[in-house]
Regions:
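Catalytic cores and adjacent flexible loops of soluble metabolic enzymes
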Residues: 2-260
């Protein structure tokens, strides 16, 4: 990957005139904060140090999405982000000068995040299926904010209907396949390049670097990369397919080289 990045820089300087690329790098924390504000603060701080543009959390009510008989119920419940916790996470991120935003899964969460002054929202793949309670109401609340929206449709869904809901928002659709981990060979690069966002579930950092290089050659102006990030000792369900802080730092370094 390093050699590929360096080769691209040399090739651009000799033969190509490509526009500068701006890549918005999102560190998806997901469940890797494990219900611990101390771990969340450490993740936020380290993601900032690694060069990420934003940290993203998931704001849902456990009882809306899971049965209390779920084998991971205790962990799920512990990882629920309440209004009080969301406010604390936003303050931590503000103090570290890194953007904080969420995938919000119910309308009241959107209303509260508006009070906190978040700049954008994420729509998760499962929300695009309209099967969770109040999915449509949640999407409509996000649309009413007029703020930028990031959308993953890794489980499918009606893109036309979703685009209609967000007709007045700046929208970035992400290429995404909801498999954990996703085998690199399953990426359809021809299809991926139809998107300006890449929500990656492969192991390591190769896939998002390849996406960035290919979008650069497409002369894209702005793209988005989302990657799950963990601490070394993370044990939650997102941990096996998440990258470490060191890997995030390496990923961002490659992306910033490619952007120029």
């Amino acid at each position: 990957v390093y050699i590929a990045s360096e080769y691209l820089i040399k090739l651009k300087s000799v033969t190509l005139k490509l526009c500068a690329l701006k890549t918005f790098v999102v560190a998806e924390i997901g469940s890797n904060w494990e219900g611990s504000l101390k771990k969340a603060e450490k993740l936020i701080r380290k993601c900032k140090d690694a060069g990420a543009d934003a940290v993203k959390f998931q704001m849902w009510r456990a009882t809306d999405l899971y049965s209390n008989t779920h084998p991971s119920w205790n962990f799920i419940k512990k990882s629920e982000i309440t209004f009080n916790i969301a406010a604390k996470l936003k303050k931590i991120a503000d103090n570290e000068s890194i953007e904080f935003f969420c995938s919000a899964f119910y309308p009241e969460a959107v209303d509260f995040l508006e009070k906190l002054g978040v700049k954008r929202y994420k729509v998760a793949s499962r929300t695009c299926l309209f099967k969770d309670p109040q999915s449509i109401e949640t999407l409509e609340n996000k649309a009413k904010t007029g703020k930028p929206i990031i959308i993953s449709m890794g489980m499918g869904g009606n893109r036309d209907q979703i685009q209609k809901i967000f007709s007045n928002n700046k929208v970035v659709f992400c290429y995404c396949i909801s498999e954990y981990p996703l085998a690199y060979e399953k990426i359809n690069w021809n299809k991926a390049l139809q998107y300006n966002g890449f929500s990656d579930h492969t192991l390591g950092i190769t896939a998002p670097i390849v996406f960035t290089v290919l979008k650069k050659f497409q002369d894209a102006k702005e793209i988005l990369i989302e990657k799950h990030v963990k601490l070394k000792n993370s044990k939650g369900p997102d941990a096996p397919t998440s990258i470490t802080i060191n890997q995030l730092s390496e990923l961002v370094s490659h992306i910033r080289l490619i952007e120029k």
